[in-house]
């Protein structure tokens, strides 16, 4: 189910404060966050946000096409390395 239109998009308060502070200073620096559930809003465009994937922080540059999506969508948590090869030779 999608979020009700009566509600505003969720953005963590600490993340919103950091974005607003950087926008008033007109500075660009990497913002480190663990908040994967936060929605990308238009004030975040142009910033680089390092999103935690469970192991490390991945820096993601926010563009206008990302608005409305969640931060966690751009930092995958699992690495699929492919299916196991047929190893009949090693079993003999």
UniProtKB/Swiss-Prot annotation:
Top-rank taxon: Eukaryota
First-listed, main subcellular location of the protein, grouped into a coarse class: plastid
Keywords on record: Chloroplast, Plastid, Ribonucleoprotein, Ribosomal protein, RNA-binding, rRNA-binding
GO cellular component: chloroplast; small ribosomal subunit
GO biological process: translation
rRNA-binding in keyword set: yes
Places the protein is found: Plastid, Chloroplast
A molecular function (GO) term: structural constituent of ribosome
Matching HAMAP family: Ribosomal_uS19
Role according to the record: Protein S19 forms a complex with S13 that binds strongly to the 16S ribosomal RNA.
Family to which this protein belongs: Belongs to the universal ribosomal protein uS19 family.
Protein name as it appears in the record: Small ribosomal subunit protein uS19c
């Amino acid at each position: 189910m999608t979020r009700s239109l009566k509600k505003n998009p969720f953005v963590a308060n600490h993340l919103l404060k950091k974005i607003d502070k950087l926008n008033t200073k007109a500075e660009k620096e990497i913002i480190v966050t663990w908040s994967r559930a936060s929605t990308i809003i238009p004030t975040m465009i142009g910033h680089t946000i390092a999103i935690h994937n469970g192991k490390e922080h991945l820096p993601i540059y926010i563009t206008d096409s990302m608005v409305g999506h969640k931060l966690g969508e751009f930092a995958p948590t699992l690495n699929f390395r492919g299916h196991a090869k047929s190893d009949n030779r090693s079993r003999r």
